[in-house]
């Protein structure tokens, strides 16, 4: 059969920016501190416009109170590293757990666009795949290419204090707590 033109059912760059604005403004209105790290798609935009990630966010949002990292990861407190990986895996949290072992901190990661947690027996470390903040049907390479990617899932994390982490799912309208983790000592 004839294939549809991906432009007919994937979002334009402008509509993707509108989604991003919506998500960031939503989080900013809900939480006192919101950390944002760039990912692989942001690097394309940064290179194209020859702008830093912070300059892109500032231009896109105008005035905001987001905490923008120039790096693809950040360390929070002494027990948590959060960031965007270069690779992905179909097992939620597996790559995050490998990062957790490497950094000796619990790890929360993006890039695989799925939610879930991984740990091993007797380990004090958690590896968590956060999910994504996107409209899955609008992602060109997911819809228009022949691939084995698992279904994308939206999610994020809320660090309530130094040791309490809520893993959240979000369908664009409703937020739900998927799991609450107590982040104990990692040593």
Which ranges hold each PLM region?
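Short, well-ordered coil/turn elements that cap or connect secondary structure elements
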Residues: 29-31, 62-63, 77, 102, ...
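Conserved beta-sheet core of the metallophosphoesterase superfamily
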Residues: 79-170, 175, 180
């Amino acid at each position: 059969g004839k294939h549809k033109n991906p432009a007919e059912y994937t979002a334009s760059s402008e509509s993707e920016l509108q989604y991003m604005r919506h998500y960031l403004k939503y989080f900013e209105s809900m939480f006192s501190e919101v950390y944002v790290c760039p990912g692989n798609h942001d690097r394309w935009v940064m290179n194209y416009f020859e702008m830093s990630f912070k300059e892109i966010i500032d231009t896109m949002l105008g005035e905001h109170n987001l905490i923008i990292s120039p790096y693809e990861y950040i360390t929070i407190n002494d027990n948590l590293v959060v960031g965007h990986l270069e690779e992905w895996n179909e097992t939620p949290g597996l790559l995050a757990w490998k990062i957790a072992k490497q950094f000796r901190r619990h790890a929360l990661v993006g890039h695989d666009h799925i939610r879930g947690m991984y740990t091993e027996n007797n380990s004090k470390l958690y590896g968590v795949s956060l999910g994504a903040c996107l409209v899955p049907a609008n992602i060109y390479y997911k819809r228009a290419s022949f691939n084995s990617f698992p279904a994308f899932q939206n999610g994020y994390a809320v660090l309530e204090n130094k040791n309490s982490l809520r893993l959240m799912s979000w369908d664009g309208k409703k937020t739900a707590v998927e799991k609450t983790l107590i982040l104990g000592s990692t040593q």
